[in-house]
Amino acid sequence: MKALMFGWEFPPHILGGLGTASYGLTKGMWECGDMDITFVIPRPHGDEDKHFANIIGASQVPVAWRDVNYDYVDQRIGKVMSPELYFRLRDHIYADFNYMRTNDLGCIEFSGRYPDNLLEEINNYSICAGVIARTIDCDVIHSHDWLTYPAGIHAKQVTGKPLVIHVHATDFDRSRGNVNPTVFAIEKDGMNNADHIITVSNLTRQTVIEKYGIDPAKVTTVHNAVTPLSQELLDIKANKSPKEKVVTFLGRITMQKGPEYFVE
Protein backbone atom coordinates (compact mmCIF):
# COMPACT_ATOMS: atom_id res chain seq x y z
CA MET A 1 0.00 0.00 0.00
CA LYS A 2 1.16 3.50 -0.83
CA ALA A 3 0.41 6.13 1.79
CA LEU A 4 0.78 9.88 1.32
CA MET A 5 1.11 11.41 4.77
CA PHE A 6 1.04 15.07 5.72
CA GLY A 7 2.59 16.19 9.00
CA TRP A 8 4.04 19.33 10.58
CA GLU A 9 6.97 17.88 12.53
CA PHE A 10 9.31 14.92 12.17
CA PRO A 11 12.19 13.94 14.48
CA PRO A 12 14.80 14.91 15.35
CA HIS A 13 13.42 18.45 14.95
CA ILE A 14 10.30 18.53 17.10
CA LEU A 15 8.54 21.08 19.28
CA GLY A 16 6.07 18.72 20.95
CA GLY A 17 4.52 15.28 20.87
CA LEU A 18 3.05 15.56 17.37
CA GLY A 19 6.33 14.79 15.61
CA THR A 20 7.16 11.92 17.95
CA ALA A 21 3.72 10.35 17.47
CA SER A 22 3.91 10.80 13.69
CA TYR A 23 7.32 9.14 13.65
CA GLY A 24 6.20 6.19 15.77
CA LEU A 25 3.07 5.57 13.72
CA THR A 26 4.94 5.82 10.42
CA LYS A 27 7.67 3.46 11.61
CA GLY A 28 5.09 1.01 12.95
CA MET A 29 3.17 1.00 9.67
CA TRP A 30 6.38 0.36 7.73
CA GLU A 31 7.29 -2.54 10.01
CA CYS A 32 3.95 -4.19 9.15
CA GLY A 33 5.37 -4.77 5.66
CA ASP A 34 4.24 -3.93 2.14
CA MET A 35 4.08 -0.20 2.90
CA ASP A 36 5.45 2.62 0.77
CA ILE A 37 5.15 5.84 2.77
CA THR A 38 5.76 9.40 1.60
CA PHE A 39 5.81 11.82 4.53
CA VAL A 40 5.48 15.54 3.79
CA ILE A 41 6.66 18.21 6.24
CA PRO A 42 6.95 21.98 5.76
CA ARG A 43 10.71 22.22 6.11
CA PRO A 44 13.12 19.27 6.38
CA HIS A 45 16.66 19.59 7.70
CA GLY A 46 18.22 16.63 5.92
CA ASP A 47 18.96 14.56 9.03
CA GLU A 48 15.53 12.92 9.29
CA ASP A 49 15.39 9.10 9.42
CA LYS A 50 14.45 8.10 5.87
CA HIS A 51 14.81 4.33 5.98
CA PHE A 52 11.04 3.77 6.40
CA ALA A 53 9.57 6.87 4.73
CA ASN A 54 10.32 9.12 1.80
CA ILE A 55 10.57 12.63 3.25
CA ILE A 56 9.39 15.53 1.09
CA GLY A 57 9.74 19.12 2.25
CA ALA A 58 7.11 21.59 1.09
CA SER A 59 9.95 24.15 1.05
CA GLN A 60 11.46 22.26 -1.90
CA VAL A 61 8.23 21.85 -3.90
CA PRO A 62 8.10 24.26 -6.85
CA VAL A 63 4.79 26.07 -7.33
CA ALA A 64 6.12 28.54 -9.93
CA TRP A 65 8.16 27.44 -12.96
CA ARG A 66 11.80 28.51 -12.92
CA ASP A 67 14.37 27.83 -15.65
CA VAL A 68 17.09 26.16 -13.57
CA ASN A 69 19.51 23.37 -14.44
CA TYR A 70 20.25 20.10 -12.67
CA ASP A 71 23.54 21.18 -11.10
CA TYR A 72 22.04 24.35 -9.65
CA VAL A 73 19.12 22.44 -8.12
CA ASP A 74 21.53 19.87 -6.69
CA GLN A 75 23.65 22.64 -5.19
CA ARG A 76 20.64 24.39 -3.65
CA ILE A 77 18.56 21.51 -2.25
CA GLY A 78 20.49 18.31 -2.93
CA LYS A 79 20.89 17.58 0.79
CA VAL A 80 17.13 17.31 1.32
CA MET A 81 15.67 16.45 -2.11
CA SER A 82 16.99 14.85 -5.28
CA PRO A 83 17.01 17.10 -8.37
CA GLU A 84 15.08 14.35 -10.21
CA LEU A 85 12.16 14.70 -7.79
CA TYR A 86 12.29 18.49 -8.02
CA PHE A 87 11.89 18.33 -11.82
CA ARG A 88 9.09 15.74 -11.55
CA LEU A 89 7.24 18.06 -9.19
CA ARG A 90 7.87 21.06 -11.45
CA ASP A 91 6.13 19.19 -14.28
CA HIS A 92 2.95 19.07 -12.16
CA ILE A 93 2.54 22.75 -11.28
CA TYR A 94 -1.20 23.15 -11.77
CA ALA A 95 -1.83 26.91 -11.69
CA ASP A 96 -0.10 30.26 -12.06
CA PHE A 97 1.33 31.04 -8.62
CA ASN A 98 3.83 33.65 -9.81
CA TYR A 99 1.97 36.24 -7.75
CA MET A 100 3.16 34.48 -4.60
CA ARG A 101 6.45 35.13 -2.85
CA THR A 102 8.77 32.34 -3.99
CA ASN A 103 12.52 31.83 -4.12
CA ASP A 104 14.85 31.28 -7.08
CA LEU A 105 13.58 27.69 -7.45
CA GLY A 106 9.93 28.76 -7.49
CA CYS A 107 9.39 27.33 -4.00
CA ILE A 108 7.57 28.83 -1.02
CA GLU A 109 9.71 29.20 2.09
CA PHE A 110 8.35 27.66 5.31
CA SER A 111 9.50 28.24 8.88
CA GLY A 112 8.89 24.64 9.89
CA ARG A 113 7.57 25.92 13.21
CA TYR A 114 4.43 27.68 14.50
CA PRO A 115 4.94 31.32 13.45
CA ASP A 116 2.60 34.28 13.82
CA ASN A 117 1.50 33.78 10.20
CA LEU A 118 0.65 30.13 10.82
CA LEU A 119 -2.63 30.27 8.90
CA GLU A 120 -0.77 31.59 5.85
CA GLU A 121 1.72 28.72 6.10
CA ILE A 122 -1.13 26.21 6.39
CA ASN A 123 -2.68 27.60 3.20
CA ASN A 124 0.67 27.58 1.38
CA TYR A 125 1.26 24.01 2.55
CA SER A 126 -2.04 22.96 0.96
CA ILE A 127 -0.95 24.58 -2.33
CA CYS A 128 2.22 22.48 -2.27
CA ALA A 129 0.10 19.43 -1.46
CA GLY A 130 -1.66 19.91 -4.79
CA VAL A 131 1.64 19.61 -6.66
CA ILE A 132 2.73 16.61 -4.60
CA ALA A 133 -0.58 14.77 -5.02
CA ARG A 134 -0.36 15.20 -8.79
CA THR A 135 3.16 13.73 -8.76
CA ILE A 136 3.24 10.96 -6.14
CA ASP A 137 0.98 7.93 -6.57
CA CYS A 138 -0.87 6.79 -3.45
CA ASP A 139 -3.67 4.54 -2.23
CA VAL A 140 -4.57 6.50 0.90
CA ILE A 141 -3.97 10.00 2.27
CA HIS A 142 -3.25 10.52 5.97
CA SER A 143 -3.22 13.97 7.61
CA HIS A 144 -1.81 14.55 11.09
CA ASP A 145 -3.66 17.20 13.13
CA TRP A 146 -5.52 20.33 12.02
CA LEU A 147 -2.52 22.06 10.47
CA THR A 148 -2.46 19.54 7.62
CA TYR A 149 -6.20 18.95 7.11
CA PRO A 150 -6.44 21.48 4.23
CA ALA A 151 -3.50 19.75 2.53
CA GLY A 152 -5.17 16.37 2.93
CA ILE A 153 -8.47 17.67 1.56
CA HIS A 154 -6.68 19.15 -1.47
CA ALA A 155 -4.85 15.88 -2.10
CA LYS A 156 -8.14 13.97 -1.88
CA GLN A 157 -9.79 16.32 -4.38
CA VAL A 158 -6.87 15.84 -6.79
CA THR A 159 -6.54 12.06 -6.52
CA GLY A 160 -9.96 10.83 -5.46
CA LYS A 161 -8.21 8.64 -2.88
CA PRO A 162 -9.63 8.15 0.64
CA LEU A 163 -8.57 10.61 3.34
CA VAL A 164 -7.85 9.58 6.92
CA ILE A 165 -7.27 12.37 9.41
CA HIS A 166 -5.44 11.78 12.69
CA VAL A 167 -6.77 13.89 15.56
CA HIS A 168 -3.93 14.19 18.06
CA ALA A 169 -5.91 16.91 19.88
CA THR A 170 -8.78 19.28 19.21
CA ASP A 171 -8.91 22.98 19.95
CA PHE A 172 -11.22 22.15 22.86
CA ASP A 173 -8.29 20.24 24.40
CA ARG A 174 -5.70 22.91 23.65
CA SER A 175 -7.78 25.87 24.83
CA ARG A 176 -9.84 24.25 27.60
CA GLY A 177 -13.06 25.28 25.88
CA ASN A 178 -12.03 28.77 24.74
CA VAL A 179 -12.08 27.68 21.10
CA ASN A 180 -10.58 29.69 18.25
CA PRO A 181 -13.38 29.81 15.62
CA THR A 182 -10.91 29.72 12.71
CA VAL A 183 -9.16 26.63 14.05
CA PHE A 184 -12.52 25.01 14.83
CA ALA A 185 -13.67 25.62 11.24
CA ILE A 186 -10.51 24.01 9.83
CA GLU A 187 -10.93 21.03 12.15
CA LYS A 188 -14.61 20.64 11.27
CA ASP A 189 -13.87 20.88 7.54
CA GLY A 190 -11.22 18.19 7.88
CA MET A 191 -13.58 15.89 9.77
CA ASN A 192 -16.42 16.42 7.31
CA ASN A 193 -14.19 15.65 4.32
CA ALA A 194 -12.39 12.69 5.87
CA ASP A 195 -13.42 9.16 4.97
CA HIS A 196 -12.32 8.05 8.42
CA ILE A 197 -11.03 9.71 11.59
CA ILE A 198 -8.44 8.36 14.02
CA THR A 199 -8.31 9.78 17.55
CA VAL A 200 -5.60 9.17 20.15
CA SER A 201 -8.00 8.54 23.04
CA ASN A 202 -11.63 7.72 23.76
CA LEU A 203 -11.99 11.16 25.36
CA THR A 204 -10.86 12.82 22.12
CA ARG A 205 -13.20 10.52 20.20
CA GLN A 206 -16.15 11.70 22.30
CA THR A 207 -15.12 15.33 21.74
CA VAL A 208 -15.07 14.76 17.97
CA ILE A 209 -18.51 13.13 18.08
CA GLU A 210 -20.19 15.56 20.48
CA LYS A 211 -18.54 18.91 19.72
CA TYR A 212 -18.12 18.51 15.96
CA GLY A 213 -21.23 16.44 15.22
CA ILE A 214 -19.42 13.52 13.60
CA ASP A 215 -20.99 10.09 13.07
CA PRO A 216 -19.52 7.71 15.70
CA ALA A 217 -19.11 4.99 13.06
CA LYS A 218 -16.59 7.23 11.32
CA VAL A 219 -14.30 7.63 14.35
CA THR A 220 -11.84 5.04 15.70
CA THR A 221 -9.54 5.34 18.70
CA VAL A 222 -5.94 4.23 18.15
CA HIS A 223 -3.84 4.87 21.25
CA ASN A 224 -0.26 6.05 20.92
CA ALA A 225 2.21 3.25 21.65
CA VAL A 226 5.27 3.27 23.89
CA THR A 227 8.75 2.62 22.52
CA PRO A 228 10.55 0.02 24.69
CA LEU A 229 13.60 1.37 26.51
CA SER A 230 17.02 0.37 25.25
CA GLN A 231 19.14 -1.93 27.41
CA GLU A 232 21.50 0.97 28.00
CA LEU A 233 18.72 2.93 29.72
CA LEU A 234 17.40 -0.11 31.56
CA ASP A 235 20.85 -0.65 33.08
CA ILE A 236 20.88 2.80 34.73
CA LYS A 237 20.67 2.49 38.51
CA ALA A 238 18.64 4.85 40.65
CA ASN A 239 20.92 7.31 42.46
CA LYS A 240 18.73 7.93 45.50
CA SER A 241 17.95 6.56 48.91
CA PRO A 242 15.36 3.73 48.97
CA LYS A 243 13.33 5.83 51.40
CA GLU A 244 13.49 8.97 49.30
CA LYS A 245 10.38 9.78 47.30
CA VAL A 246 10.58 11.64 44.01
CA VAL A 247 7.47 12.87 42.19
CA THR A 248 7.94 13.96 38.59
CA PHE A 249 5.74 15.89 36.19
CA LEU A 250 6.97 15.06 32.71
CA GLY A 251 5.43 17.36 30.12
CA ARG A 252 5.28 20.87 28.75
CA ILE A 253 4.15 23.55 31.20
CA THR A 254 1.03 24.37 29.21
CA MET A 255 -2.69 24.45 29.94
CA GLN A 256 -3.31 21.36 27.82
CA LYS A 257 -0.87 19.20 29.81
CA GLY A 258 -2.49 20.15 33.11
CA PRO A 259 0.45 20.87 35.48
CA GLU A 260 -1.87 22.84 37.78
CA TYR A 261 -4.05 19.75 38.26
CA PHE A 262 -0.90 17.80 39.07
CA VAL A 263 0.17 20.31 41.72
CA GLU A 264 -3.32 20.54 43.24
Role assignments for model-derived ranges:
Residues L203, A225:
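Carbohydrate-associated surface elements
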Residues M1-K2, L229-V246:
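Nucleotide-sugar donor-binding and catalytic loop/hinge architecture
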Residues A3, V140-H142, Y149, I153-R174, ...:
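Active-site proximal beta-strand in glycosyltransferases
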Residues E9-A21, D47-K50, K257:
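A short, glycine/small-residue-rich beta-strand->loop->alpha-helix junction that serves as a flexible
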Residues L118-C128, K161-V164, F172-D189, P228:
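Nucleotide-sugar donor phosphate/pyrophosphate-binding loop at the beta->alpha transition
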Residues C32-A133:
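A conserved catalytic-core segment of Leloir-type glycosyltransferases
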Residues I198, N239-V263:
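Conserved donor-binding/catalytic core segment of Leloir-type glycosyltransferases
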Residues G130-T135, Q157, N180-I197:
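Membrane-proximal helix-turn-helix segments that form the acceptor-binding/catalytic region
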